[in-house]
Each structure stands twice: as structure tokens, then as C-alpha cells.
Design a protein with these regions (language model features):
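Bacterial N-terminal signal peptides that target proteins for export
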Residues: 1-11
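Short, well-ordered alpha-helical
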Residues: 29-126, 130-133, 164-165, 275-279, ...
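Sec-exported extracytoplasmic/periplasmic mature domains
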Residues: 48-55, 65-77, 86-89, 93-100, ...
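Structural helix-boundary/capping segments
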Residues: 70, 200-302, 310-311, 322-329, ...
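Short helix-loop capping/hinge segments that flank enzyme active sites or metal/cofactor-binding pockets
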Residues: 108-127, 290, 295-305, 356-426, ...
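Short glycine/serine-rich loop/turn segments
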Residues: 108-249, 274-278, 302-306, 437-455, ...
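Gly/Ser-rich, acidic/histidine-flanked active-site/gating loops
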Residues: 118, 124, 246-248, 275-360, ...
Length: 529
């Protein structure tokens, strides 16, 4: 595995015993409180601890850096982190120096992992590709800038499936990301570094991108919450692109409430992304206000049966999902069976996906915007050979071979089929009076390391329609020698456009009723090692 470009010298101190967040000197005179566990911390919990003086922002950031030092390139060697931000500790100290000003911001001192396809002004954005090593954007992506304006600290850029083209999270710069719940398996993808890092307690929040599955797949595989928003709700300006038809971004977090908090900071119109014009008047005043434990009472949820597998390898996911469906009913939801072959994911991927038609023009445009990009077009990346050939070469060659993919008759035919499918999904919602559709994000458990195709995923429904979808922990497979607590399984809830508040409410009610989040055995509290 190539060495990771980690700016450790500016960020890390020697690991010494337990990672307990630095206490305020005044608070230290009081009886010692229980240790503050950064690995399970929430945004609300951190705000309270900072306000009370129980922790400092510097101590919080150091706590996460210590866990990264212990578990990313040591211990289980998760390989979730591509680069640390050398300014993170200084930014934390600035918060502590102006605690009143920082506390006034909704995300004051919230350390974040950003997938390495988010432009950042102080860190290269490489997409995990050796061909783009050192590529330095001139400014932050809009989403990153808004998070910082809300007080967040970019702690690190996360490893990912190279160029976001696949689902096993392997890259030429960062190597293979491991799933902390089963170190022999992949973490889903393409946002797998964010997924593994958030599961392992490397930060307080994470951000991913999703063309087909790529936020919700790592959420599903790592016992997390992943929200793909309505296309246009969050700006894509400064995000390394794959498909203008299918791309969206969103948070990956340990709780639904944290996802709502990050969404609130990012959502809204942006002149740099014309798609966001549709979001005018659509941003909820408070997504947190929708988080009610009884939100499932009276909800009508369509269970899309064609998105469940029927083969032996699907049995574990089906078992977990049945338990989750029972929990939805117990919480007051009405389940409506949807038997509709139009939702068949493999057919939608095969016949309607437009990534190879759009990728070349979009990537060439993005590379032209990076002042020092080592290659200025897709042809240059291909010619360099500096990418994970087994994972990417077939796609890159297919995309480059299209002289003008978006002018091809088949591309236009696919757009027509996408429009028809989107209209059909809207009709299903209306005819059945549904609040959301329900299905497993993956029909089977995430594949073992070494396989290059993350088979049997269902994310294409949201990818083609642009509808929002949230993935929440549904349970885990049976325990095994390599997965002491089982492999996590996620449940997708897909809603109509701009229904993020409703989806967050449904997901929150399920989360509160089930309480399924557990820290992986491979990354325990440091003092417990």
C-alpha cells in the first residue's frame, strides 16, 4: 500500500494512555466527571460539554487525532484517512480562545471527515488517485465553506473508492479501506473512508457523495446514518463530479440528530450551482424540529419487495430487515406491500444509468478548474496509468471513448427513461398515499476485501429520481469469527422531493425505538485496550 500523505507532525502527539478529552482547569477542581468518550460523542453532547467547561475544543480534536493514530495505520489499520489537516489543532485553540464567539455558531468545534472529493483550500483534493496527488483547489467547496462558517473544523480528508467510481473503497493513494466491524470485508463505498472513520470514532461528523449508492452503502455497512438529499438541496459546487444527472451529497453520522444538524448548515441556494435554484423556499427552518420519537405513528411506508433478494446469500439481510419491519409496525407505521418490477435495481443500473455518458465532460471541466492539477483531462489520467487499474480502467476507457457522450442518441433515450421512471415513482407515492418507501440498501452483506464489485445494491432508485433517501442501522448479521458482533445492515427510507424533514423524523423515531448503534470491537475506547 502506498504511504498515506498524513501531515502528522503538525497534528499528532504521542499516544499516552486513555484518550480522554482535556478538562477545563476550573472544572478540574470539581469532583472528576465520568470520562468524555469522543468515539460515541454527539454534536449536542459536545456543545453541552464545551459550555460547561468539561472539555476544551483542543482536547476534543486531540482525542480524535489519538484514535486515528491508534487505529488507522496501526492496530486494525483501517486506512480510512487520506490526509490530516495540519491546521486543525490551531483552529481548535482559536475556538477555545474565543469560546463565547464559537459557542454562538451551531457547529462550533465540530470536527469533520470530508470525503476526498470535496474541495478544500488548505488540503489537496485527489479523489484518492495517484494521478491527482497534490491537486490543490483554490477554494473550499460550497458545502465545506458553509460547514466552516457554522463553526465546524475540517479534521481530515477521507480515503474513498478512487474517483468515486465503485463501491469497495480502494484507491491508488490510500489503499483498501477496511470495515471496522469485520476487517476481512469492505466498508461499502464509494464514501468508505468516511464510513469506516465515523464508525471507529475518528470524528464527530462526516460528509460523503452519492451518485448511486455511495453515502448510504457505507452507512449501511458501518452501522451509521447516511442521508442523500434531494438533488439541488445542497450545492455541488467544488465537488469532484461523476454525473450531473445522478450526483448528490450529504452527511454520514452516528445519529439522526447529527445528520440533521449538518444538513441545516449546508442546505440552500448557491449561484455557483444552478440546480440549487429549485431549493428556494424548500429548506426547512429547523430540521431538528422534525425529530420526534412518535413520528412513525400513522406513517404509511411502502415495502418494495423487488428490492429484497431471494437467494441464499440474501438470507441474513432479509432476516435483519424483517426484524426492522416489525419494529416499524410496532412504532405505529402501516406497511404497504409494493410489488412492482419497475423498481428492479439491476435493470435500472443496466438500462438507465448515465455515468459513462456524462463523466468525461464533467471531469475535464473540473480538472480545468484546479490550478495545479497534474492532468488537465481524463485522457491525461488514463495515459498516466496512475490509478487503480483493476478497479477503474474499464470505466475510464469507456468514458474516454465517448467523443461526446451527452449528444449520443442512447444518452437521450436514457434520460427519457429516467423521466418516465421518476413519474412512475411519484404515481406510486400518490396512489398508495405513502410517506416513504422502505428497502434494504444492500440485498447482501458487503463483499470481502479483494472483490471489486459491491454486488446487489439498491441505491439506484434515489440516484435516478433525485429523491432523498436516508439509511439507518437496521441490525447486524449473526456473529462470526471475523465479525464478533455481526456485519451491519442498513435500511433505506426514500421520500418525495424536499421531504428531508419527514425522512429525518421517521428515521429518528426508528433509531430511538431500536437503539442499534454499537462501537466496533476492533476500535474500542483507547483506555480499554
Amino acid at each position: 500500500m502506498p504511504p498515506i500523505a498524513l501531515a502528522r507532525s503538525a497534528c499528532l502527539v504521542a499516544l499516552a494512555g486513555a484518550v480522554l478529552v482535556q478538562a477545563d482547569p476550573v472544572a478540574a477542581q470539581a469532583p472528576a466527571p465520568a470520562p468524555f468518550r469522543v468515539e460515541d460523542a454527539t454534536i449536542a453532547g459536545v456543545r453541552e460539554a464545551l459550555a460547561s467547561g468539561r472539555i476544551t475544543c483542543r482536547g476534543l480534536v486531540q482525542g480524535y487525532l489519538d484514535r486515528i493514530a491508534a487505529y488507522d495505520q496501526a492496530g486494525p489499520k483501517l486506512a480510512a484517512i487520506r490526509a490530516l489537516n495540519p491546521q486543525a489543532l490551531a483552529q481548535a485553540e482559536a475556538y477555545d480562545a474565543d469560546r463565547a464567539g464559537g459557542a454562538a455558531k451551531p457547529l462550533g468545534c465540530v470536527p469533520l471527515l470530508l470525503k476526498d472529493n470535496y474541495d478544500t483550500a488548505e488540503l489537496p483534493t485527489t479523489g484518492g488517485s495517484a494521478a491527482l496527488a497534490g491537486a490543490q483547489p483554490a477554494q473550499d467547496a460550497t458545502a465545506a465553506a458553509r460547514l466552516r462558517a457554522a463553526g465546524a473544523i475540517v479534521l481530515a480528508k477521507a480515503n474513498m473508492q478512487e474517483l468515486a467510481l465503485g463501491g469497495v473503497s480502494v484507491s491508488s493513494l490510500g489503499g483498501q479501506v477496511r470495515n471496522p466491524y469485520d476487517l476481512t470485508r469492505t466498508p461499502g463505498g464509494s464514501s468508505g473512508g468516511v464510513g469506516a472513520g465515523m464508525a471507529a470514532g475518528f470524528a464527530l461528523g462526516g460528509l460523503g457523495s452519492d451518485t448511486v449508492n455511495s453515502i448510504r452503502s457505507p452507512a449501511s455497512a458501518n452501522n451509521l446514518v447516511g442521508l442523500r438529499v434531494t438533488q439541488g438541496l445542497i450545492s455541488l459546487a467544488g465537488i469532484m463530479p461523476v454525473s450531473k444527472t445522478q450526483d448528490a451529497i450529504g452527511p454520514i453520522t452516528r445519529t439522526v440528530a447529527d445528520a440533521a444538524a449538518l444538513l441545516q448548515a449546508m442546505a440552500g441556494t448557491d449561484p455557483a450551482d444552478p440546480l440549487t435554484a429549485a431549493a428556494a423556499g424548500k429548506v426547512a427552518p429547523s430540521y431538528a424540529a422534525a425529530l420526534k420519537p412518535d413520528a412513525l405513528k400513522g406513517a404509511r411506508l411502502g415495502v418494495v419487495r423487488v428490492l429484497f433478494g431471494t437467494k441464499p446469500e440474501h438470507a441474513e439481510v432479509n432476516r435483519v430487515m424483517q426484524t426492522a419491519l416489525d419494529a416499524l409496525e410496532a412504532a405505529g407505521a402501516t406497511l404497504v406491500r409494493i410489488d412492482d418490477p419497475a423498481f428492479e435495481a439491476d435493470a435500472l443500473n443496466r438500462e438507465d444509468d448515465v455515468q459513462t455518458y456524462e463523466y468525461k465532460a464533467l471531469m475535464n471541466g473540473y480538472l480545468a478548474s484546479i490550478p495545479n492539477a497534474p492532468h488537465k483531462d481524463l485522457a491525461g489520467i488514463l495515459a498516466s496509468g496512475q490509478f487503480h487499474r483493476a478497479a477503474l480502467e474499464s470505466f475510464l476507457k469507456a468514458a474516454e471513448a465517448r467523443r461526446d457522450g451527452m449528444a449520443e442518441p442512447e444518452y437521450k433515450a436514457r434520460l427519457g427513461r429516467i423521466a418516465a421512471f421518476k413519474a412512475h415513482v411519484a404515481e406510486v407515492f400518490a396512489a398508495q398515499k405513502l410517506d416513504a418507501l422502505v428497502y434494504p440498501l444492500q440485498k447482501r452483506l458487503v463483499v470481502p476485501i479483494g472483490e471489486l464489485n459491491q454486488a446487489d445494491r439498491n441505491g439506484i432508485v434515489a440516484g435516478l429520481t433525485g429523491y432523498p433517501a436516508i439509511d439507518v442501522p437496521a441490525g447486524s448479521s449473526e456473529a462470526s469469527a471475523t465479525a464478533p458482533a455481526g456485519v451491519p445492515v442498513g435500511m433505506d427510507l426514500l421520500g418525495q422531493p424536499w421531504s428531508e424533514a419527514k425522512l429525518l423524523g421517521l428515521a429518528y423515531a426508528f433509531e430511538q425505538a431500536t437503539n442499534l448503534r454499537r462501537l466496533p470491537a476492533s476500535t474500542p475506547p483507547l483506555e480499554a485496550r
